[in-house]
């Protein structure tokens, strides 16, 4: 796990107020910023920091943008949905995807059901 710290007290003046990322899995420290003695992104053994006092620093990681698309798919025949509108008692468990979430078809109003059918089954794009 990576944690961020700012060194607030150290016998080494170069470490005072420096900011580090500590990796507990590798026991390494990566310098984020230091006034002297260390380079940005320099990696050292965490033990090489010696004795120090520190405060936690919040680490923000920007969201990773991967792109791509999302597709909701209902694998049904138009006739099945139309029959569910006419005879809801025959389809108590019929679940469809609407706007990214699952919903019981029978819980929709008749108007919503007809809208779903119209949007799902089109003659052209």
Curated annotation (Swiss-Prot):
Protein name: Autonomous glycyl radical cofactor
Upper lineage: Bacteria, Pseudomonadati, Pseudomonadota, Gammaproteobacteria, Vibrionales
InterPro entries, per database record: Auton_GlycylRad_Cofactor, Form_AcTrfase_GR_CS, Gly_radical, Glycyl_radical_cofactor_GrcA
Start and end residues of each Glycine radical domain: 5-125
Glycine radical: residues carrying this PTM: 100
GO CC, alphabetical: cytosol
Regions that span the bilayer: none
GO molecular function: formate C-acetyltransferase activity
UniProt organism field: Photobacterium profundum (strain SS9)
Keyword Transit peptide: no
Pfam families the UniProt entry points to: Gly_radical
SUPFAM superfamilies documented for this protein: PFL-like glycyl radical enzymes
Function (record text): Acts as a radical domain for damaged PFL and possibly other radical proteins.
Keywords: Organic radical
């Amino acid at each position: 796990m990576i944690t961020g710290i700012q060194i607030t007290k150290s016998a080494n003046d170069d470490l005072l107020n420096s900011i580090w990322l500590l990796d507990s899995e590798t026991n390494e420290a990566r310098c984020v910023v230091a006034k002297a003695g260390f380079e940005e992104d320099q990696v050292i053994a965490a033990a090489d920091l010696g004795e120090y006092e520190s405060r936690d620093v919040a680490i923000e990681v920007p969201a990773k943008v991967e792109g791509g698309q999302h597709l909701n798919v209902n694998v049904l025949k138009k006739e099945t949905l139309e029959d569910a509108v006419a005879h809801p008692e025959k389809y108590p468990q019929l679940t469809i995807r609407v706007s990214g979430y699952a919903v019981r078809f029978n819980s929709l109003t008749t108007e919503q059901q007809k809208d779903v059918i119209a949007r799902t089954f089109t003659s052209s794009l």
